[in-house]
Amino acid sequence: MEQAELEKKLGEMKAPRVTEESIKAKIDRVDYMSMATPSGGMGTLCVISMKNGWISTGFSAPASKSNFDPAVGEHYSYQKAFEPLWQLEGYLLKESLSKDK
């Protein structure tokens, strides 16, 4: 399915659902830490702090330290920290919907 077709279908859905925007609205702050290991490895840690106090972390590291780029590390570590929030928010929505019955 092409991206445009997917976005159209998602836009037509009327039932409650978790969206990227709904998750982002619950984020309090995002912090990044670039780090080096004693053996010369490099990596980036992302910590997403939610408004309710929950934290989600993601880590990214290149196979070769010569490929380390802070912006790339932040991008991938953020994705890894954000991904588990979909499942958690989906569970919360399902729990809420089940109580409405």
Which residues fall in each region the model found?
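Domain-level marker for long, solvent-exposed, non-transmembrane regions
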Residues: 1-101
